[in-house]
Protein backbone atom coordinates (compact mmCIF):
# COMPACT_ATOMS: atom_id res chain seq x y z
CA UNK A 1 0.00 0.00 0.00
CA UNK A 2 1.22 3.48 -0.76
CA UNK A 3 1.57 6.10 1.87
CA UNK A 4 -1.87 7.56 2.64
CA UNK A 5 -0.54 10.39 4.79
CA UNK A 6 -0.77 12.71 1.85
CA UNK A 7 -1.92 16.19 1.09
CA UNK A 8 -1.49 18.45 -1.86
CA UNK A 9 -1.15 21.25 0.65
CA UNK A 10 2.57 20.55 0.60
CA UNK A 11 2.40 21.51 -3.03
CA UNK A 12 0.75 24.73 -1.98
CA UNK A 13 3.33 25.46 0.69
CA UNK A 14 6.22 24.67 -1.59
CA UNK A 15 4.81 26.36 -4.65
CA UNK A 16 3.75 29.52 -2.91
CA UNK A 17 7.29 29.96 -1.64
CA UNK A 18 8.17 30.79 -5.24
CA UNK A 19 5.57 33.60 -5.30
CA UNK A 20 6.29 37.01 -3.72
CA UNK A 21 4.40 37.85 -0.55
CA UNK A 22 2.50 40.64 -2.30
CA UNK A 23 1.20 38.22 -4.94
CA UNK A 24 0.37 35.54 -2.37
CA UNK A 25 -1.96 37.94 -0.53
CA UNK A 26 -3.50 39.33 -3.72
CA UNK A 27 -7.10 38.23 -4.13
CA UNK A 28 -8.17 36.69 -7.43
CA UNK A 29 -11.57 35.56 -8.66
CA UNK A 30 -11.78 32.02 -10.06
CA UNK A 31 -13.75 31.39 -13.20
CA UNK A 32 -17.04 29.48 -12.81
CA UNK A 33 -15.60 26.08 -13.62
CA UNK A 34 -12.69 26.46 -11.20
CA UNK A 35 -15.00 27.99 -8.58
CA UNK A 36 -17.23 24.93 -8.83
CA UNK A 37 -14.20 22.71 -8.21
CA UNK A 38 -13.12 24.74 -5.19
CA UNK A 39 -16.57 24.76 -3.61
CA UNK A 40 -16.79 20.98 -3.99
CA UNK A 41 -14.07 20.63 -1.36
CA UNK A 42 -15.39 23.22 1.11
CA UNK A 43 -14.57 26.62 -0.39
CA UNK A 44 -17.29 29.20 0.36
CA UNK A 45 -16.05 32.54 -1.01
CA UNK A 46 -15.88 34.05 -4.48
CA UNK A 47 -12.38 35.52 -4.15
CA UNK A 48 -9.31 33.73 -2.86
CA UNK A 49 -5.60 34.11 -2.50
CA UNK A 50 -3.16 31.91 -4.39
CA UNK A 51 -2.41 29.97 -1.21
CA UNK A 52 -6.06 29.09 -0.76
CA UNK A 53 -6.56 28.08 -4.39
CA UNK A 54 -3.55 25.77 -4.40
CA UNK A 55 -4.62 24.30 -1.07
CA UNK A 56 -8.16 23.51 -2.29
CA UNK A 57 -6.82 22.00 -5.52
CA UNK A 58 -4.61 19.75 -3.42
CA UNK A 59 -7.57 18.78 -1.26
CA UNK A 60 -9.54 17.96 -4.39
CA UNK A 61 -6.77 15.72 -5.77
CA UNK A 62 -6.45 13.97 -2.41
CA UNK A 63 -10.20 13.46 -2.00
CA UNK A 64 -10.70 12.09 -5.52
CA UNK A 65 -7.41 10.11 -5.32
CA UNK A 66 -6.39 11.28 -8.77
CA UNK A 67 -2.68 10.74 -8.13
CA UNK A 68 -0.74 7.63 -9.13
CA UNK A 69 -0.14 5.29 -6.20
CA UNK A 70 3.40 4.40 -7.32
CA UNK A 71 4.46 7.79 -8.67
CA UNK A 72 2.54 10.17 -6.47
CA UNK A 73 3.65 13.31 -8.28
CA UNK A 74 1.64 12.32 -11.39
CA UNK A 75 -2.05 13.32 -11.44
CA UNK A 76 -4.57 11.76 -13.88
CA UNK A 77 -7.56 14.02 -14.57
CA UNK A 78 -8.79 13.00 -18.02
CA UNK A 79 -12.38 12.15 -16.98
CA UNK A 80 -12.68 14.62 -14.15
CA UNK A 81 -13.63 18.22 -13.53
CA UNK A 82 -9.96 19.06 -12.88
CA UNK A 83 -9.12 17.93 -16.42
CA UNK A 84 -11.82 20.21 -17.82
CA UNK A 85 -10.42 23.12 -15.82
CA UNK A 86 -6.76 22.59 -16.76
CA UNK A 87 -7.42 21.20 -20.23
CA UNK A 88 -4.91 18.34 -19.90
CA UNK A 89 -5.45 14.60 -19.29
CA UNK A 90 -2.58 14.40 -16.78
CA UNK A 91 0.19 16.50 -15.29
CA UNK A 92 3.01 16.34 -12.76
CA UNK A 93 3.25 18.57 -9.73
CA UNK A 94 6.97 18.85 -10.40
CA UNK A 95 6.11 21.02 -13.39
CA UNK A 96 5.16 23.94 -11.17
CA UNK A 97 5.46 26.54 -13.92
CA UNK A 98 2.98 24.62 -16.03
CA UNK A 99 0.61 24.36 -13.04
CA UNK A 100 0.85 28.12 -12.44
CA UNK A 101 0.01 28.81 -16.07
CA UNK A 102 -3.01 26.46 -15.97
CA UNK A 103 -4.27 28.06 -12.75
CA UNK A 104 -3.76 31.62 -14.02
CA UNK A 105 -5.83 30.84 -17.11
CA UNK A 106 -8.82 30.25 -14.84
CA UNK A 107 -8.40 33.38 -12.68
CA UNK A 108 -9.61 36.93 -13.02
CA UNK A 109 -7.78 39.73 -11.23
CA UNK A 110 -9.67 41.80 -8.65
CA UNK A 111 -9.18 45.56 -8.24
CA UNK A 112 -7.45 46.94 -5.14
CA UNK A 113 -10.65 48.25 -3.54
CA UNK A 114 -12.42 45.00 -4.23
CA UNK A 115 -9.51 42.98 -2.93
CA UNK A 116 -9.30 45.08 0.25
CA UNK A 117 -12.94 44.59 1.10
CA UNK A 118 -12.79 40.89 0.24
CA UNK A 119 -9.71 40.46 2.41
CA UNK A 120 -11.37 42.13 5.37
CA UNK A 121 -14.41 39.99 4.77
CA UNK A 122 -12.34 36.81 4.70
CA UNK A 123 -10.67 37.83 7.95
CA UNK A 124 -13.96 38.59 9.68
CA UNK A 125 -15.64 35.45 8.47
CA UNK A 126 -13.87 32.93 10.78
CA UNK A 127 -14.53 35.15 13.80
CA UNK A 128 -18.22 35.73 13.23
CA UNK A 129 -18.86 32.40 11.65
CA UNK A 130 -21.21 33.98 9.08
CA UNK A 131 -21.01 33.32 5.35
CA UNK A 132 -22.58 36.68 4.34
CA UNK A 133 -20.83 38.69 1.68
CA UNK A 134 -20.22 42.42 1.91
CA UNK A 135 -23.18 44.23 0.28
CA UNK A 136 -21.02 47.27 -0.30
CA UNK A 137 -18.66 45.31 -2.52
CA UNK A 138 -18.31 47.30 -5.70
CA UNK A 139 -18.14 45.61 -9.08
CA UNK A 140 -14.68 45.65 -10.60
CA UNK A 141 -14.14 48.51 -12.96
CA UNK A 142 -11.15 47.11 -14.87
CA UNK A 143 -10.38 43.43 -15.16
CA UNK A 144 -7.06 42.71 -16.79
CA UNK A 145 -6.88 39.58 -18.85
CA UNK A 146 -5.22 36.40 -17.68
CA UNK A 147 -2.34 36.89 -20.14
CA UNK A 148 -1.58 40.30 -18.60
CA UNK A 149 -1.63 38.76 -15.14
CA UNK A 150 0.76 35.97 -16.17
CA UNK A 151 3.17 38.40 -17.82
CA UNK A 152 3.09 40.66 -14.76
CA UNK A 153 3.78 37.78 -12.38
CA UNK A 154 6.56 36.40 -14.55
CA UNK A 155 8.20 39.84 -14.73
CA UNK A 156 8.11 40.22 -10.96
CA UNK A 157 9.44 36.70 -10.48
CA UNK A 158 12.33 37.45 -12.84
CA UNK A 159 13.15 40.62 -10.92
CA UNK A 160 13.07 38.69 -7.67
CA UNK A 161 15.36 35.98 -9.05
CA UNK A 162 17.85 38.60 -10.26
CA UNK A 163 17.90 40.30 -6.87
CA UNK A 164 18.34 36.96 -5.12
CA UNK A 165 21.25 36.14 -7.43
CA UNK A 166 22.97 39.43 -6.58
CA UNK A 167 22.45 38.81 -2.88
CA UNK A 168 23.85 35.29 -3.11
CA UNK A 169 27.11 36.57 -4.57
CA UNK A 170 27.79 38.58 -1.37
CA UNK A 171 26.98 35.78 1.04
CA UNK A 172 29.53 33.81 2.96
CA UNK A 173 30.00 30.07 2.25
CA UNK A 174 28.30 29.09 5.52
CA UNK A 175 25.29 31.31 4.83
CA UNK A 176 25.11 29.98 1.28
CA UNK A 177 25.07 26.43 2.63
CA UNK A 178 22.24 27.28 5.06
CA UNK A 179 20.26 29.03 2.35
CA UNK A 180 20.76 26.05 0.09
CA UNK A 181 19.28 23.85 2.81
CA UNK A 182 16.29 26.17 3.16
CA UNK A 183 15.72 26.30 -0.59
CA UNK A 184 15.81 22.53 -0.83
CA UNK A 185 13.34 22.28 2.01
CA UNK A 186 10.79 24.38 0.13
CA UNK A 187 11.48 23.03 -3.35
CA UNK A 188 8.22 22.85 -5.36
CA UNK A 189 9.29 19.60 -6.99
CA UNK A 190 8.66 17.84 -3.69
CA UNK A 191 4.96 18.64 -3.79
CA UNK A 192 3.38 15.23 -4.17
CA UNK A 193 6.35 13.05 -3.29
CA UNK A 194 5.00 12.75 0.25
CA UNK A 195 1.41 14.08 0.37
CA UNK A 196 0.30 14.75 3.92
CA UNK A 197 -3.21 14.96 5.26
CA UNK A 198 -3.68 18.43 6.69
CA UNK A 199 -7.42 18.67 7.19
CA UNK A 200 -8.67 16.12 9.72
CA UNK A 201 -11.95 17.95 10.26
CA UNK A 202 -13.39 17.23 6.79
CA UNK A 203 -14.31 19.59 4.03
CA UNK A 204 -15.86 22.26 6.31
CA UNK A 205 -12.59 24.02 7.07
CA UNK A 206 -12.51 27.74 6.37
CA UNK A 207 -10.00 29.65 4.25
CA UNK A 208 -8.07 31.00 7.23
CA UNK A 209 -7.72 27.62 8.89
CA UNK A 210 -6.64 26.13 5.59
CA UNK A 211 -3.96 28.78 5.16
CA UNK A 212 -2.69 28.16 8.70
CA UNK A 213 -2.56 24.42 8.08
CA UNK A 214 -0.72 25.14 4.87
CA UNK A 215 1.99 27.13 6.61
CA UNK A 216 2.44 24.63 9.44
CA UNK A 217 3.83 21.68 7.41
CA UNK A 218 5.85 23.93 5.18
CA UNK A 219 7.96 25.18 8.09
CA UNK A 220 7.97 22.23 10.48
CA UNK A 221 7.31 18.93 8.75
CA UNK A 222 9.10 19.64 5.51
CA UNK A 223 12.35 20.56 7.25
CA UNK A 224 12.41 17.11 8.87
CA UNK A 225 10.95 14.92 6.13
CA UNK A 226 12.14 16.45 2.91
CA UNK A 227 15.83 15.96 3.70
CA UNK A 228 15.31 12.18 3.63
CA UNK A 229 13.68 12.20 0.18
CA UNK A 230 15.49 15.13 -1.40
CA UNK A 231 17.83 12.84 -3.33
CA UNK A 232 14.98 10.96 -5.06
CA UNK A 233 12.46 13.72 -5.71
CA UNK A 234 14.72 16.68 -6.44
CA UNK A 235 14.09 18.28 -9.81
CA UNK A 236 17.14 19.53 -11.66
CA UNK A 237 15.30 22.46 -13.24
CA UNK A 238 13.98 23.74 -9.93
CA UNK A 239 17.39 23.40 -8.27
CA UNK A 240 19.10 25.27 -11.07
CA UNK A 241 16.53 28.07 -10.73
CA UNK A 242 17.28 28.55 -7.05
CA UNK A 243 21.05 28.28 -6.80
CA UNK A 244 24.10 27.17 -8.74
CA UNK A 245 27.36 25.79 -7.39
CA UNK A 246 30.58 26.27 -9.34
CA UNK A 247 33.96 24.99 -8.26
CA UNK A 248 37.32 24.02 -9.74
CA UNK A 249 39.27 20.93 -8.87
CA UNK A 250 42.53 21.90 -7.19
CA UNK A 251 45.69 20.42 -8.66
CA UNK A 252 49.41 20.60 -8.01
CA UNK A 253 49.76 23.05 -10.90
CA UNK A 254 47.34 25.57 -9.38
CA UNK A 255 48.86 28.86 -8.27
CA UNK A 256 46.97 28.99 -4.98
CA UNK A 257 47.66 25.39 -4.06
CA UNK A 258 48.81 24.83 -0.49
CA UNK A 259 49.40 21.70 1.55
CA UNK A 260 47.65 23.16 4.59
CA UNK A 261 45.13 25.86 5.42
CA UNK A 262 47.86 28.44 6.08
CA UNK A 263 49.86 27.40 3.00
CA UNK A 264 53.61 27.30 2.61
CA UNK A 265 56.03 27.18 -0.27
CA UNK A 266 57.66 23.99 -1.41
CA UNK A 267 61.07 23.50 0.16
CA UNK A 268 64.20 21.87 -1.23
CA UNK A 269 63.31 18.59 0.44
CA UNK A 270 59.99 18.54 -1.40
CA UNK A 271 61.84 19.16 -4.67
CA UNK A 272 64.15 16.24 -4.01
CA UNK A 273 61.19 13.91 -3.76
CA UNK A 274 60.32 14.57 -7.39
CA UNK A 275 63.90 14.08 -8.58
CA UNK A 276 64.10 10.41 -7.64
CA UNK A 277 65.06 8.27 -10.64
CA UNK A 278 63.91 4.66 -10.60
CA UNK A 279 66.16 2.18 -12.39
CA UNK A 280 64.59 -1.07 -13.49
CA UNK A 281 67.06 -3.88 -12.84
CA UNK A 282 65.47 -6.75 -14.69
CA UNK A 283 67.16 -9.48 -16.72
CA UNK A 284 68.62 -7.08 -19.25
CA UNK A 285 72.40 -7.08 -19.64
CA UNK A 286 72.66 -3.36 -20.34
CA UNK A 287 72.00 -0.49 -17.98
CA UNK A 288 70.62 2.94 -18.80
CA UNK A 289 72.73 5.98 -17.95
CA UNK A 290 70.49 8.55 -19.62
CA UNK A 291 69.03 9.74 -16.31
CA UNK A 292 72.33 9.75 -14.41
CA UNK A 293 73.31 13.37 -13.70
CA UNK A 294 76.95 12.38 -13.01
CA UNK A 295 77.51 11.30 -16.64
CA UNK A 296 77.58 14.05 -19.25
CA UNK A 297 77.74 13.91 -23.03
CA UNK A 298 81.50 14.39 -22.83
CA UNK A 299 81.81 10.90 -21.32
CA UNK A 300 80.14 9.21 -24.29
CA UNK A 301 82.29 7.43 -26.89
CA UNK A 302 81.82 7.51 -30.64
CA UNK A 303 81.64 4.31 -32.66
CA UNK A 304 84.23 4.08 -35.44
CA UNK A 305 81.87 2.16 -37.73
CA UNK A 306 78.55 4.00 -37.58
CA UNK A 307 79.52 7.21 -35.69
CA UNK A 308 76.91 6.49 -33.00
CA UNK A 309 77.38 8.13 -29.59
CA UNK A 310 77.23 5.46 -26.87
CA UNK A 311 77.28 5.60 -23.04
CA UNK A 312 80.67 5.03 -21.40
CA UNK A 313 79.92 1.66 -19.80
CA UNK A 314 78.72 -0.65 -22.63
CA UNK A 315 81.62 -2.16 -24.57
CA UNK A 316 79.66 -2.59 -27.81
CA UNK A 317 77.90 -0.06 -29.99
CA UNK A 318 74.15 -0.17 -29.44
CA UNK A 319 73.48 0.25 -33.17
CA UNK A 320 76.00 -1.94 -35.02
CA UNK A 321 77.29 -3.95 -32.02
CA UNK A 322 80.91 -3.13 -32.85
CA UNK A 323 83.45 -3.52 -30.08
CA UNK A 324 84.68 -0.25 -28.67
CA UNK A 325 88.13 0.79 -29.86
CA UNK A 326 90.91 0.16 -27.31
CA UNK A 327 88.41 -1.53 -25.01
CA UNK A 328 90.74 -4.55 -24.50
CA UNK A 329 94.54 -4.40 -23.99
CA UNK A 330 96.98 -5.14 -26.87
CA UNK A 331 98.61 -8.12 -25.02
CA UNK A 332 95.93 -10.41 -26.32
CA UNK A 333 97.62 -10.59 -29.74
CA UNK A 334 100.99 -11.34 -28.17
CA UNK A 335 99.50 -14.23 -26.24
CA UNK A 336 98.19 -15.74 -29.45
CA UNK A 337 101.65 -15.47 -31.09
CA UNK A 338 103.32 -17.09 -28.06
CA UNK A 339 100.82 -19.93 -28.06
CA UNK A 340 101.47 -20.62 -31.75
CA UNK A 341 105.26 -20.57 -31.22
CA UNK A 342 104.89 -22.95 -28.28
CA UNK A 343 102.92 -25.38 -30.41
CA UNK A 344 105.61 -25.30 -33.11
CA UNK A 345 108.37 -25.99 -30.57
CA UNK A 346 106.49 -28.95 -29.13
CA UNK A 347 106.00 -30.42 -32.60
CA UNK A 348 109.70 -30.00 -33.45
CA UNK A 349 110.76 -31.61 -30.14
CA UNK A 350 108.55 -34.61 -30.83
CA UNK A 351 110.01 -34.96 -34.33
CA UNK A 352 113.63 -34.87 -33.09
CA UNK A 353 113.24 -37.52 -30.36
CA UNK A 354 114.94 -40.88 -31.25
CA UNK A 355 116.48 -39.68 -34.57
CA UNK A 356 119.89 -38.36 -33.37
CA UNK A 357 123.10 -40.17 -34.57
CA UNK A 358 126.73 -39.93 -33.23
CA UNK A 359 127.93 -37.69 -36.06
CA UNK A 360 125.03 -35.30 -35.41
CA UNK A 361 123.34 -36.07 -38.77
CA UNK A 362 119.69 -36.99 -39.07
CA UNK A 363 118.71 -40.23 -40.66
CA UNK A 364 116.07 -40.21 -43.31
CA UNK A 365 113.52 -42.88 -43.84
CA UNK A 366 115.27 -44.03 -47.04
CA UNK A 367 118.59 -44.44 -45.25
CA UNK A 368 117.00 -46.45 -42.49
CA UNK A 369 115.34 -48.76 -44.99
CA UNK A 370 118.48 -49.67 -47.04
CA UNK A 371 118.57 -53.47 -47.66
CA UNK A 372 121.48 -55.50 -46.35
CA UNK A 373 120.81 -58.58 -48.51
CA UNK A 374 123.36 -57.52 -51.16
CA UNK A 375 126.33 -57.95 -48.86
CA UNK A 376 127.97 -61.29 -48.57
CA UNK A 377 127.76 -63.41 -45.54
CA UNK A 378 131.46 -62.90 -44.96
CA UNK A 379 131.13 -59.18 -44.90
CA UNK A 380 128.27 -59.57 -42.48
CA UNK A 381 130.43 -61.73 -40.27
CA UNK A 382 133.25 -59.20 -40.36
CA UNK A 383 131.01 -56.24 -39.74
CA UNK A 384 129.12 -57.73 -36.84
CA UNK A 385 131.79 -56.96 -34.23
CA UNK A 386 132.24 -53.52 -35.71
CA UNK A 387 128.52 -52.86 -35.55
CA UNK A 388 128.44 -54.05 -31.98
CA UNK A 389 131.26 -51.69 -31.11
CA UNK A 390 129.55 -48.86 -32.90
CA UNK A 391 126.36 -49.66 -31.02
CA UNK A 392 128.32 -49.56 -27.79
CA UNK A 393 129.58 -46.12 -28.66
CA UNK A 394 126.31 -44.88 -30.04
CA UNK A 395 124.10 -45.70 -27.04
CA UNK A 396 125.58 -43.13 -24.61
CA UNK A 397 125.51 -40.41 -27.27
CA UNK A 398 121.82 -41.09 -28.02
CA UNK A 399 120.84 -41.06 -24.33
CA UNK A 400 122.79 -37.88 -23.68
CA UNK A 401 121.09 -36.17 -26.64
CA UNK A 402 117.65 -37.19 -25.35
CA UNK A 403 118.43 -35.81 -21.87
CA UNK A 404 119.71 -32.59 -23.36
CA UNK A 405 116.63 -32.13 -25.51
CA UNK A 406 114.32 -32.80 -22.56
CA UNK A 407 116.19 -30.26 -20.43
CA UNK A 408 115.87 -27.69 -23.19
CA UNK A 409 112.13 -28.33 -23.51
CA UNK A 410 111.67 -27.95 -19.74
CA UNK A 411 113.58 -24.67 -19.80
CA UNK A 412 111.47 -23.44 -22.69
CA UNK A 413 108.27 -24.35 -20.85
CA UNK A 414 109.46 -22.50 -17.74
CA UNK A 415 110.35 -19.46 -19.79
CA UNK A 416 106.97 -19.56 -21.51
CA UNK A 417 105.08 -19.80 -18.21
CA UNK A 418 107.15 -16.95 -16.80
CA UNK A 419 106.45 -14.87 -19.89
CA UNK A 420 102.74 -15.67 -19.61
CA UNK A 421 102.68 -14.73 -15.93
CA UNK A 422 104.49 -11.52 -16.72
CA UNK A 423 102.03 -10.77 -19.49
CA UNK A 424 99.08 -11.41 -17.15
CA UNK A 425 100.64 -9.21 -14.48
CA UNK A 426 101.38 -6.53 -17.01
CA UNK A 427 97.84 -6.71 -18.37
CA UNK A 428 96.44 -6.57 -14.83
CA UNK A 429 98.60 -3.57 -14.02
CA UNK A 430 97.58 -1.93 -17.28
CA UNK A 431 93.93 -2.56 -16.51
CA UNK A 432 94.40 -1.12 -13.05
CA UNK A 433 96.20 1.92 -14.40
CA UNK A 434 93.46 2.58 -16.97
CA UNK A 435 90.88 5.20 -15.94
CA UNK A 436 87.43 4.40 -14.63
CA UNK A 437 85.02 3.27 -17.35
CA UNK A 438 82.27 5.47 -15.89
CA UNK A 439 83.93 8.82 -15.23
CA UNK A 440 87.01 8.26 -17.44
CA UNK A 441 89.01 10.42 -15.04
CA UNK A 442 90.00 8.60 -11.85
CA UNK A 443 91.96 5.31 -11.68
CA UNK A 444 90.29 1.96 -11.12
CA UNK A 445 90.67 1.63 -7.37
CA UNK A 446 87.13 0.67 -6.31
CA UNK A 447 86.58 -3.09 -6.26
CA UNK A 448 82.91 -4.12 -6.46
CA UNK A 449 82.58 -7.16 -4.16
CA UNK A 450 79.70 -9.63 -4.40
CA UNK A 451 80.07 -12.82 -2.41
CA UNK A 452 83.60 -14.23 -2.73
CA UNK A 453 84.33 -12.49 -6.03
CA UNK A 454 84.73 -8.91 -7.15
CA UNK A 455 85.19 -6.80 -10.27
CA UNK A 456 87.64 -3.92 -10.65
CA UNK A 457 86.24 -1.73 -13.38
CA UNK A 458 85.57 1.69 -11.82
CA UNK A 459 86.95 4.17 -9.35
CA UNK A 460 86.01 4.13 -5.69
CA UNK A 461 83.70 7.16 -6.03
CA UNK A 462 81.67 5.74 -8.91
CA UNK A 463 81.49 2.35 -7.22
CA UNK A 464 80.14 3.96 -4.04
CA UNK A 465 77.49 5.73 -6.09
CA UNK A 466 76.42 2.44 -7.64
CA UNK A 467 76.19 0.88 -4.18
CA UNK A 468 74.23 3.84 -2.79
CA UNK A 469 71.68 3.62 -5.62
CA UNK A 470 71.21 -0.13 -5.07
CA UNK A 471 72.37 -0.93 -8.58
CA UNK A 472 73.87 -4.30 -9.55
CA UNK A 473 77.41 -4.94 -10.67
CA UNK A 474 77.75 -3.62 -14.24
CA UNK A 475 79.81 -6.66 -15.25
CA UNK A 476 77.95 -9.68 -13.86
CA UNK A 477 74.63 -8.05 -12.77
CA UNK A 478 74.94 -9.46 -9.24
CA UNK A 479 73.85 -7.36 -6.25
CA UNK A 480 76.71 -5.31 -4.82
CA UNK A 481 77.64 -6.41 -1.30
CA UNK A 482 80.40 -3.92 -0.53
CA UNK A 483 82.97 -1.59 -2.12
CA UNK A 484 86.69 -2.05 -1.33
CA UNK A 485 89.28 0.68 -1.88
CA UNK A 486 92.22 -1.01 -3.66
CA UNK A 487 95.88 0.14 -3.59
CA UNK A 488 98.58 -0.84 -6.14
CA UNK A 489 102.37 -0.84 -5.55
From Swiss-Prot:
SUPFAM superfamilies: Ran binding protein zinc finger-like (SSF90209), RING/U-box (SSF57850), SWIB/MDM2 domain (SSF47592). A zinc finger (RanBP2-type) spans 297-326. A motif (Nuclear export signal) lies at residues 183-195. CDD domains: MDM2, mRING-HC-C2H2C4_MDM2. It is found in: Nucleus, Nucleoplasm; Cytoplasm; Nucleus, Nucleolus; Nucleus. Pfam families: SWIB, zf-C3HC4_3, Zn_ribbon_RanBP. Residues 208-302 are annotated as: ARF-binding. Residues 1-22, 114-183, 197-235, 250-271, 342-426 are annotated as: Disordered. Residues 240-329 are annotated as: Region II. Interacts with p53/TP53, TP73/p73, RBL5 and RP11. Binds specifically to RNA. Can interact with RB1, E1A-associated protein EP300 and the E2F1 transcription factor. Forms a ternary complex with p53/TP53 and WWOX. Interacts with CDKN2AIP, RFWD3, USP7, PYHIN1 and RBBP6. Interacts with ARRB1 and ARRB2. Interacts with PSMA3. Found in a trimeric complex with MDM2, MDM4 and USP2. Interacts with USP2 (via N-terminus and C-terminus). Interacts with MDM4. Part of a complex with MDM2, DAXX, RASSF1 and USP7. Part of a complex with DAXX, MDM2 and USP7. Interacts directly with DAXX and USP7. This is E3 ubiquitin-protein ligase Mdm2. It comes from Mus musculus (Mouse). The lineage of its organism: Eukaryota, Metazoa, Chordata, Craniata, Vertebrata.
